[in-house]
Amino acid sequence: MALTYPHLLSPVKVGGVVLRNRLICTASNPHFIQATEKWPTEALITHYANKAKAGAAVVTCKGNNPVKTTDPHSLTLDIHTGQHQHMFAQVAEAVHYYGAKASYLVLPDMNIVKGYDASDGVLSEFVAGDGSKAELGKAAPRELLYRMVEEYGKEAKLAQSLGFDMCFM
């Protein structure tokens, strides 16, 4: 019997980084794994660690800026608050313990981009700022896009300082 993906579990070198296989866990936050905490709880840290333990080469942690939302189940973590940062560092450490690379999902600050979208008149779930409903937005001006690039860079640097190996955008 021939394997469809014979190299799936083989190591791969991407740039200067060697991944133990080609399994990548994208961002996931189970909605009910924690309450309203704005930092990764032990349960969420264990969730990410288990993905690494199960064999993923890269585990992506979601940790965007908190926003006011109409979704009561929205899980928005806050990596920018100093007293929360050690918990994000524990996520990276737990993922590293099982031999995986820790990735951090960088998302736009919805407080900045609310009301804007990629183009005028396109129905989008991102216009409302929380994904709760689709609305028509207006095209983001160039200045806002440059500001977002700066914010992405700052957040990526912060994640790196807390032990994350890469960012997912």
Would you name each region that the model predicts?
Residues 1-169:
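Flavin-dependent oxidoreductase catalytic cores
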